[in-house]
Amino acid sequence: MTASDAADVYRSAIVCDMLLPYMYGADPAKYLTLERIRASGVSFVSITTAVDWHTLEETVHILARERAYLRAHSDQYVLAESAEDIMSAKRDGRLAIAFNVQGTNPLQSDLGMIEVLHRLGVRHMLLTYNQHNTVGGGGYEASDGGLGKFGRMVVREMNRVGMLVDLSHTGHRSCMEAFEIASAPLSFTHSNPLALWDNPRNIGDDMIRACAQSGGVVGVTGIGLHMGDNDASTEMICRQIDHIAGLVGPEHVGIGLSYVHDNVAFMADFNGHAAWAVAPDLAPRVSQSLSPAEYAFATPEQLLGLAEVMMRRGYDTEAIQNILGGNWVRVARRIWR
């Protein structure tokens, strides 16, 4: 197989990136990232519109602004509310976009807001964002009390309305309890194997297996500090894929790059919220000696090369195309409505 063969496989694939963070700011330069993603051959991306520190009012305003932008640029982008919207956008040469919320605090303990956010285009939501909230335990906490009563209600309501439950950033016990009560596939849209790198944001093999048993997908993230010594190379991304595919099969692996277009601005905003100011703990062995500008993130342009690396490692065309996005489309077909 040649690089040309890999390019053909990539061009014909439905390429999905399930996590583009930092889209809630008003900086117009961020939209250049969307154009880069579209130009790189990606078919679908899910953009973060709010995090656990946002209020419901802030979240709705952000969603309104992003929806207006998509309407004004409908020749390039389309709001994806169904799996068919993704397929249609691929045929039209447009980038399909859905929204995500990283954490459930923006609900402000109102279960009815899940359906409201769904109608505004939110297609997956994290239960927590590193810290405890009213739903469950965060992945950065020393202890995890599991899902509370409201947390169980949230999982069931998300299943009902057709919103993917995203367990990234969530504590172990809360994740496993969510798997027990869910009636639809659950996923980790941007999480890497703990077995490969000891980092509080990474997930254990038992969590990967539980995700696969639910019918879900683990999205490999391209954050260098979550893969090794600040290494965001394409080969390192494929190493994450190899581990997950070897454990549960390639049908349960996807991509959630979590690419940050402006490291310095992102980390300044992140650390401006005291409860979430945990950046030095992202990888204690490495990040203490790095400035935010030095944090490595895999870029959308690396995805074509990822297809080539997977081909060299023996993945067949079907597996490559499913990992690049077909597996996420399968989950969307089953959940989104």
Q: How should these model regions be labeled?
A:
Residues 195:
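Gly/Ser/Thr-rich loop/hinge elements
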Residues 78-79, 163-170:
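Catalytic beta/alpha-barrel core
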Residues 191:
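Ligand/cofactor pocket segment of small-molecule handling proteins
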Residues 110-114, 171-184:
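Distinct, well-ordered alpha-helical segments
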Residues 115, 156-159, 164, 210:
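Feature for exported/extracytoplasmic and membrane-associated proteins, marking the mature portion
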Residues 1-144, 149, 198-337:
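N-terminal hydrophobic targeting/anchoring segments and the immediately downstream early-domain regions
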Residues 68-72, 143-161, 178-188, 306:
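Alpha-helix-loop-beta-strand connector modules within alpha/beta enzyme cores
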